[in-house]
Design a protein with these regions (language model features):
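Hydrophobic, aromatic-rich transmembrane alpha-helices
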Residues: 64-69, 345-374, 387-392, 414-415
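Membrane-lumen/periplasm interface segments of specific transmembrane helices
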Residues: 20-34, 275, 279-361
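Short acidic/glycine- and proline-prone juxtamembrane loop motifs at membrane-interface regions
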Residues: 214-226
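Membrane-interface alpha helices of multi-pass inner-membrane proteins
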Residues: 210-217, 248-275, 297-298
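Start-transfer (signal-anchor) and selected internal transmembrane alpha helices
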Residues: 1-18, 43-112, 292-294
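Specific aromatic-rich, kink-prone transmembrane helix
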Residues: 188, 226-244, 248, 411, ...
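Transmembrane-helix motifs of polytopic, lipid-linked glycan transferases
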Residues: 63-71, 173-196, 230
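Perimembrane helix-loop-helix junctions
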Residues: 234-250, 267-296, 365
Length: 444
């Protein structure tokens, strides 16, 4: 065993110890103080060993990706790889969701009391609903919004309102929308990686993006949909600055503007966007007008929502009040500030822990000869990690971060491209995801 491999294993073991500590300390706090408001800390889940109709498919997808994923990713034509990655990610997410059954795993996820579909009827007049949106954020106001609606800007809810308007009504359609769009997130990351760090590393990352344990929570979670929108904004930004494309710049700005109106916390994606610009700054030097196209696209959604009567900043301040009115004001910051990182270790898996060790090595001076592709990938991953840490320190995400931080987790997974001999690491990722899905009943 080489020294480098031993260090990779140490990193994976450190992540496992962090998760173990979060479980043991969390159980003690919950049993003695009852302040965590989760049944299986640090995850928002219940212990419920079970099998389901998705079990055979999940095992088959996992076995296929572990056995053939690296070789197929290396040989397929680029566009074929993108299509295969999306199809495989979709199959993995759906099969894991169906372990819980169609109703419990997909169709019922977005219809519970705190979810978006419960308020569709209150948006029969969309302009009026937007003008009145901030009046129902704080608890104690007339007809306060359920937690997820109050906790997000209105574009999140409007997505499902518009699906309903075009005839795609109910939890089944909403769940499959989130899964289908969410599965494209890995494609966006691959496109960005190829533009910034080269095709070889993108191909090595592909199986890990497909077989991520995060898929357990991507199944019918709106945050999986948010993650994909944010990822495409970065992919288009990478194409804009490397290809000097005004169209891609405008589209990137448009999607980042939408991202900010899907989730307040995803404004932190600006940090990852800054890393993209730094890595391809030559494109902006040659065509500084790309900034104007980016800003023009970025302005669209803020202008539309502001003119419609929704004040983003005012809504965010009201959300902070609402957050501390509820369990967010009771959950102990001293536990969650590190237990949230344990949740991230769970959804990204042991391979990512080992990969993050290698990204650190790639950035440290004096750690060996610099390779530009590896350094570019490491900078991108580090920017995502920094954004996640800022979100953690803010205290606005205490618990449920295995779902809430899916958008950031998606950009940590490329670190796995730096690992040699990918199959054992892929197997570890798959086993973790299968155990999580079959031993726990996850919720949000």
């Amino acid at each position: 065993m080489t020294r480098s491999l031993r260090r990779d294993l140490y990193a994976a073991c450190a992540a496992a110890l962090l998760v173990t500590a979060a479980v043991l300390v969390g159980r003690h706090i919950q049993d003695t103080r009852h302040t965590l408001f989760v049944h299986w800390p640090p995850l928002f889940a219940d212990w419920d060993p079970h099998l389901g109709p998705g079990t055979p498919a999940a095992l088959a997808v996992a076995a296929a990706v572990v056995a053939y994923g690296p070789a197929v990713a290396a040989r397929l034509p680029w566009r074929g790889l993108l299509a295969a990655a999306w199809a495989s990610a979709l199959a993995w997410i759906v099969s894991l969701a169906l372990v819980d059954g169609w109703r419990r795993g997909i169709a019922g996820r977005l219809t519970t009391r705190n979810e978006y579909l419960r308020v569709i009827g209150r948006f029969h007049d969309i302009p009026a609903a937007l003008r009145d949106f901030t009046h129902h954020i704080v608890s104690g106001t007339p007809d306060p919004w359920p937690a997820h609606i109050a906790g997000h800007p209105p574009a999140a809810t409007l997505t499902f309102v518009l699906l309903d308007r075009i005839g795609l009504r109910g939890g089944g359609w909403a769940g499959m929308w989130c899964i289908t769009v969410g599965a494209t997130g890995c494609v966006a990351v691959l496109i960005a990686l190829r533009a910034l760090a080269g095709e070889a590393l993108a191909r090595r990352a592909a199986p890990f993006l497909v077989l991520a344990p995060a898929a357990v929570w991507q199944g019918a979670s709106a945050d999986g949909y948010f993650a994909a929108v944010a990822a495409w904004s970065l992919a288009l930004l990478a194409l804009a600055v490397t290809r000097r494309s005004h169209g891609c710049a405008a589209a990137s700005g448009l999607l980042f503007g939408l991202t900010c109106y899907l989730s307040y916390g995803l404004t932190l994606f600006a940090l990852i966007g800054a890393a993209v610009v730094v890595l391809a700054r030559g494109g902006l030097r040659e065509r500084p007008a790309l900034v104007l196209s980016l800003l023009a696209g970025l302005a669209v959604f803020p202008v539309v929502f502001t003119l419609a009567g929704f004040d983003w900043w005012h809504a965010y301040h009201l959300l902070v009040t609402r957050y501390y009115q509820g369990v967010g004001g009771t959950r102990p910051y001293g536990y969650w500030v590190w237990a949230n990182l344990a949740c991230t270790a769970v959804i990204t898996g042991p391979a990512t822990a080992a990969g993050l060790r290698r990204t650190t090595t790639a950035l440290l001076p004096g750690s060996g000869p610099r390779r530009l592709p590896e350094t570019a990938l490491a900078l991108l991953v580090t920017a995502a990690l920094l954004a996640l840490l800022i979100a953690d320190l803010s205290g606005m995400s205490k618990a449920e971060t295995e779902r809430i931080w899916l958008p950031f987790a998606l950009w940590l997974l490329p670190a796995c491209a730096l690992l040699p001999r990918p199959r054992p690491w892929l197997a570890a990722q798959a086993v973790l995801a299968l155990l999580l899905n079959h031993l726990l009943l996850t919720g949000w």
